[in-house]
Every structure is written in structure tokens, then in C-alpha cells.
């Protein structure tokens, strides 16, 4: 084997069905343009860095075994707008630590119990008192023994009740000592003991119940609700809550969970000699705590404050399963999750120059895939990893079994990424989309895409730590207010990338011009640069002077408000944009190249430049565009609207007056007259018909005689011829 070769475990479930001896190892994937290239159990060669596996020949027929595992579908990792921050922060930064402590203090300030023990109530009868030595009784007298029979309810309600035995009377603020009177008698310093106990048990104030019906995490959701996604608010089974419970579960399992700065501040499970708080509920008595601190948390320490929140947010953990994860990962997750909310709320989302760090997609992809491949739980479920050919580029992917176990596998992956949020967030992670031929699986952390987007407070240039194969990247973080609109964001960033390219090319020689293109795999842009230093200096000068940025932004906004796609998006009143440019000063294929500076050879590291956030009022610009538009043509009326309205009224009245108008009563009377006339005509018609019938009956006889006479005369005339004949 050549130098740099290594052996890795096979991460696929056997060879493809169409594999033949000497054939291609690339596996076609339905729904994805390209193939899957799995790792091989015997790699014939790889790069020195191990970043890309090498294609290998197929094994002989004797090595081919039947596929025993279920079919797995490749899922590539995609970071959409809501899953990514273009800049991230340093966990050890003093300002970050201060904001985290401030955030948690604001949540728990009404629930913290002071270390005062001068008003504690000990329920001891005469026999119990006799068992105590004189020095102990004297110390109890110094604390203050209160007789319930001689005290009113108001006085008793503000006390912590210390009981040495559990009887039928349980007060909401009861501390029970399992060791009994003997334990109390053995204490060398009663007052100091209880002061220490109360210090390391952050409970509610004395005048309220010590049992948490609502945890501090619920208070955080209420106080900082706008920083959480709408479906996250009020829920308990999300990222932060589950991680805090995992922390207490580890402590309950005996794992050391401590502040990395103050290692003696640890959470541990209660021992039989520790006091246990009880509360009287509808269904009996409940333990409000299973955990205690080995030492009081250090004030103004953000991680100690996070441990306080974990303790006060814990419930009964008897039902929980084993948590197999290092507590440092969980502590990092809880701390950075709270820090993101704290920076967004108190820091207005802006990071100071010293607190700014670069982000990197490729690093996060590698971390997620490595976490999945090393997870024994996911391996048992059949989840593996592989390389997938997408658009002629090999990408690392997660292979998830398709079938009944699919949703179980996705849930397990979601849980793993939630627990490792702290590590991933160090590089900008806020969530991920797993894309397969069957669709998209969205894994979110519950943080709001608008209110938790971090930006730089000032423009800065720093070293870019990256594992990317791309040399030059342009990223933008665009937020629309008051409603986030994907169409406006996509259109504006496309227009801005075009204007950005024009401004750069206008400032450099023709041979140094760049061509900015949209990445086919994510929301970023990339470009090639023949002279990276020249391009980088030009961009830095653009940001420094501001003139080119003004022109670039102005033209992009003008085209945005007049775009047919966005002109109907009237719900967007303003837009905010941050730009980051990441560049390698040396091309990735020629990293040995050096630059001579002041007579010395010096390797330039990859750099990134981030701008502050620019905010533009779209509503005012939209109004101005509408006023200046050619479609906006005011019409000057010869008459006012009031005058025209009066003319319309007069026109109608004139038209009605020109007709023979009659009232409703006149119309009724006319109708009645017509009816009467009709009835009279009908009556006359009936009379005429009757008279005509009688006349016909009287004239019957005369008519017959007349007819006879006429017939006779005719016959006579016919019998006697006239003279002429």
C-alpha cells in the first residue's frame, strides 16, 4: 500500500445487485442525479488527508454475500436559511459568560433561596429535645425554636419546617431529615450545616412551596418567548429541556457533572443523610429535588448558573433510561443554547469584534456524519454513512433504513444532534435538513430564525477555519420585518450578488474579474479568483469606504421593490442584510504557493470578512417608487367630487320629474277604477246577450210566413210569363 492508505469498516449493507466482477462500485441512486460511492472494507488507496475515499475494484464472486440488512436511502445534509448563522461566538468570552449569567438570573431571581437560617422551625417533642446534647440545644436556641401552638399561621408560613420523622402532617415548606434526631445531634455546627445545605439547593423563597410545579425552564420560555419558534413555546420536550434532564440523569447515574471552570461545583444524587424537600399535593407527597450541589455555585459564572437551571428543572428521574453521552457535551449544549438566547435578547444579536468566529458548512457536515457513524445506538438500528455523487460532486450522506424503523432512526438522529448542539453550534449550526429521494426531514433546535440570527456589531476580518473544497464563498443573512418572507429574501440576495459582482469587477483589472454563481447544493454563492489578494483588498476597501456598498445596496433595493415577484409583498416593511466573504489567499490545488512580503516568504491563511448589519426601510422606498412610477398619473378633475355628486343627484331628480309621476295612493285608485269599469262593461255585455236571445224567439213565426209568401210569389211569377216573353 502507498503512504497515506488506511483501512475503514464497510458502511454499506453489501454490494449492489448489479455488481459484477471488475465492475463499477458506484451505486445508482433513484431520485438523485448521480451515484453512491460506499466505503470499502479494503481500500486500495486514499488521499493523504483522508478526506475523499478512492474508488476500488469489486471483490470476487466468493466475497459477495446476500444482503441481510434492509434497504437504506441516502440522506444528504442541507442547511437552509433557518438552519444557519453566518457568524458564531466564543463560549469562553467574558461578555458571553456575563450575558448567560444575566439571562438565568433574570429567570430565577424570584425563586432563589437565601442562606439565612435564623428563622427555621424545628418540630421536636420533649423526647427529641432530651436526646440532644446541651451544646446542640444551645445552637438550636440561637437559631430560634418556634412553638407552633404559640405562633400564628402567617409566622409559620414563612419558615422552613425541619422534621425528624415523617408523620401525617406535611407542610409545603418541609425539610425532612432521614437521619432523625441522632443525625441532628451529631452535627458539630447546626447553623452552619443548614446554611450550607440551603446554599447548594436553589429553591423557592420561604413564603412559597418548595415543590416545583413549574420548572425554571418554563420561566425561560415565558420570559424569552420571542426567541423560540412558535411550536417550541411552552413545550417541555424540546432541545434545552431534554438536555437539562439528561444532565440530571447522568448525575443520578453517578456520573460526575461539574462546571469545567469550577471543578468542585458538581451535581450529585441525594444520599440518605441529605435533607429532602417534600410538598403536599393532590396525590400525596412528592420529592422536589433528587440533586444537590457538592459546593455552592460560583456567582456570575454562566456555566454554574446553567447547572442551577438543570437542578431546578429536574423532576423524578426514576423512569428515565440510561444516557450514554459525555456530560461535557451536554454542558456545552445547555450553555450555548442559553447563550444564543442571551446574546439575542440582551446583546441585540450583535457580537463584539473579539467575540466573532467564522462558520463552516463542511466542518459541520463532517462532524454530523462522524457522530452518526460512531453512535452505537444508530449502528444497532442499521444507520450507516456513505459518499453520494450529487451533480458530479461527492457528498457525505447518512444512510437510513427504509421501512417500519425509519421514524425510529430519524428520532434517534434528532436526539443525538440535540445533545451535540453545543459542538455543532460552534460552527454556525442551528438545524439541518436531511434530503432524500422521498422528501425532506427537517431537524430544528427550536430557536427562532429571525430573533436568534447573530450578526457582527462591526466589520471585521479574521482567519477562516474551513474544511470546504471551495476556495471563495459569498454568504448573506437577510431578515425581513415584521414577517419573514422567503420570496423577498431569495430575490434580494440574487440581485445583491449580481450587484456585488459588478462592483468588484469595476474595481479590478479585466483579467482579475470574477463570476459569482449560486451554489447548487445550498443557499451560498461561490466564485473563482485568479488573484485572490486583489479581490480581497477590493472587497475590504468597498466595506471600508462605504461608497460602493451604498451604490450596490441601493441598486439592489431599487430592483427589488420594482420586481414583479416582490412588488405584491406589502407585508414586508423593512429588510436587514449582513454579508460575509470567505476566501483562500492561495488556491486549494496549489497550497504550497507563497507570497513574498517585505522580502520574507509568508503563507497567507484563509480569511473571512464580515460586514455589520445594514437595515433598510422598504415601506418608505416603496412609496417613493410608486410616486415616481410612470403608471402613477394623477387626473385633474374639472369639478370636485362633491360637485359631481350633486350633479348626479340633480340629474336623477330631473329625469323623474319629467315623467307623469303619481303617488302610491293614486296608483291604487286608478287600479280600482279600472276594475270597476271592467265590471260595468262585463255587466252591459251580459244584458246585450240576453236581449238578443229574446228577440230571436219572437221573430220565428213572421219569418216563416214571409218565407212562404216569398216562395208563393216566386212560383206565381214562374207560372205566368211576362209580356216581353
Swiss-Prot record:
Region (Disordered) residue spans: 1-26, 666-725
Disulfide bridge positions per record: none
Composition skew (Basic and acidic residues), residue ranges: 675-686
Polar residues bias (residue ranges): 7-16
Biased composition (Acidic residues): 687-709
Protein name (record): Non-structural protein 4
Amino acid at each position: 500500500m502507498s503512504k497515506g492508505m488506511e483501512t475503514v469498516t464497510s458502511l454499506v449493507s453489501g454490494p449492489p445487485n448489479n455488481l459484477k466482477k471488475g465492475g463499477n462500485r458506484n451505486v445508482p441512486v433513484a431520485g438523485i442525479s448521480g451515484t453512491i460511492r460506499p466505503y470499502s472494507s479494503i481500500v486500495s488507496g486514499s488521499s493523504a488527508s483522508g478526506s475523499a475515499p478512492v474508488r476500488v475494484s469489486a471483490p470476487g464472486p466468493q466475497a459477495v454475500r446476500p444482503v441481510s440488512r434492509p434497504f437504506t436511502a441516502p440522506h444528504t445534509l442541507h442547511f437552509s436559511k433557518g438552519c444557519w448563522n453566518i457568524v458564531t461566538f466564543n463560549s469562553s468570552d467574558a461578555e458571553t459568560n456575563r450575558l448567560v449569567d444575566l439571562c438565568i438570573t433574570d429567570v430565577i431571581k424570584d425563586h432563589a433561596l437565601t442562606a439565612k437560617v435564623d428563622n427555621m422551625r424545628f418540630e421536636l417533642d420533649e423526647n427529641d429535645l432530651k436526646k440532644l446534647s446541651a451544646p446542640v440545644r444551645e445552637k438550636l436556641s440561637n437559631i430560634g425554636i418556634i412553638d407552633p401552638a404559640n405562633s400564628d399561621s402567617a409566622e409559620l408560613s414563612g419558615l422552613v419546617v425541619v422534621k425528624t420523622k415523617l408523620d401525617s402532617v406535611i407542610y409545603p415548606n418541609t425539610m425532612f431529615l432521614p437521619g432523625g434526631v441522632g443525625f441532628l445531634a451529631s452535627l458539630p455546627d447546626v447553623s452552619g450545616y443548614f446554611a450550607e445545605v440551603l446554599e447548594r439547593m436553589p429553591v423557592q423563597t420561604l413564603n412559597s412551596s418548595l415543590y416545583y410545579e413549574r420548572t425554571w425552564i418554563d420561566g425561560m420560555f415565558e420570559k424569552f418567548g420571542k426567541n423560540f419558534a412558535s411550536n417550541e413555546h411552552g413545550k417541555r420536550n424540546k432541545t434545552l429541556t431534554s438536555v437539562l434532564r439528561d444532565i440530571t440523569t447522568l448525575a443520578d447515574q453517578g456520573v460526575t457533572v461539574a462546571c469545567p471552570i469550577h471543578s468542585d461545583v458538581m451535581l450529585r444524587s441525594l444520599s440518605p443523610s441529605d435533607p429532602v424537600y417534600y410538598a403536599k399535593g393532590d396525590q400525596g407527597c412528592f420529592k422536589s429535588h433528587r440533586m444537590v450541589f457538592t459546593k455552592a455555585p460560583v456567582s456570575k459564572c454562566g456555566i454554574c448558573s446553567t447547572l442551577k437551571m438543570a437542578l431546578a428543572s429536574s423532576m423524578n428521574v426514576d423512569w428515565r433510561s440510561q444516557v450514554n453521552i459525555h456530560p461535557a457535551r451536554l454542558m456545552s449544549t445547555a450553555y450555548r443554547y442559553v447563550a444564543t438566547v442571551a446574546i439575542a435578547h440582551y446583546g441585540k444579536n450583535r457580537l463584539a469584534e473579539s467575540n466573532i468566529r467564522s462558520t463552516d458548512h463542511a466542518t459541520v457536515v463532517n462532524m454530523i456524519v462522524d457522530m452518526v457513524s460512531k453512535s452505537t445506538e444508530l449502528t444497532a438500528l442499521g444507520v450507516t454513512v456513505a459518499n453520494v455523487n450529487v451533480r458530479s460532486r461527492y457528498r457525505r450522506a447518512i444512510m437510513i433504513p427504509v421501512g417500519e424503523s425509519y421514524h425510529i432512526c430519524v428520532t434517534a438522529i434528532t436526539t443525538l444532534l440535540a445533545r451535540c448542539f453545543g459542538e455543532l453550534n460552534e460552527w454556525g449550526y442551528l438545524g439541518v435538513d436531511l434530503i432524500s429521494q422521498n422528501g425532506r426531514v427537517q431537524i430544528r433546535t427550536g430557536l427562532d430564525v429571525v430573533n436568534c440570527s447573530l450578526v457582527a456589531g462591526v466589520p471585521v476580518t479574521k482567519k477562516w477555519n474551513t474544511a470546504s473544497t471551495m476556495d471563495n464563498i459569498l454568504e448573506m443573512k437577510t431578515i425581513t420585518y415584521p414577517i419573514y418572507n422567503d420570496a423577498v429574501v431569495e430575490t434580494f440576495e440574487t440581485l445583491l450578488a449580481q450587484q456585488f459582482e459588478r462592483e468588484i469587477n469595476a474595481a479590478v483589472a479585466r483579467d482579475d474579474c470574477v463570476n459569482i454563481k449560486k451554489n447548487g447544493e445550498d443557499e451560498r454563492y461561490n466564485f473563482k479568483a485568479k488573484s485572490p489578494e486583489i479581490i480581497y483588498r477590493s472587497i475590504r476597501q468597498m466595506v471600508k469606504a462605504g461608497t460602493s456598498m451604498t451604490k450596490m445596496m441601493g441598486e439592489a433595493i431599487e430592483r427589488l421593490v420594482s420586481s414583479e415577484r416582490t412588488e405584491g409583498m406589502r407585508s414586508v416593511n423593512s429588510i436587514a442584510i449582513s454579508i460575509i466573504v470567505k476566501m483562500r489567499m492561495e488556491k486549494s490545488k496549489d497550497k504550497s504557493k507563497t507570497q513574498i512580503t517585505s522580502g520574507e516568504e509568508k503563507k497567507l491563511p484563509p480569511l473571512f470578512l464580515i460586514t455589520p448589519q445594514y437595515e433598510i426601510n422598504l415601506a418608505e422606498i416603496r412609496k417613493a417608487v410608486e410616486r415616481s412610477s410612470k403608471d402613477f398619473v394623477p387626473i385633474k378633475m374639472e369639478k370636485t367630487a362633491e360637485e359631481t355628486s350633486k350633479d348626479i343627484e340633480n340629474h336623477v331628480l330631473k329625469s323623474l320629474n319629467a315623467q307623469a309621476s303619481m303617488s302610491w295612493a293614486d296608483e291604487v285608485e286608478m287600479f280600482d277604477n279600472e276594475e270597476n269599469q271592467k265590471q260595468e262593461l262585463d255587466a252591459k255585455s251580459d244584458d246585450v246577450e240576453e236581449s238578443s236571445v229574446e228577440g230571436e224567439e219572437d221573430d220565428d213565426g213572421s219569418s216563416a210566413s214571409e218565407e212562404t209568401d216569398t216562395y208563393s210569389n216566386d212560383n206565381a211569377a214562374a207560372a205566368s210569363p211576362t209580356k216581353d216573353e
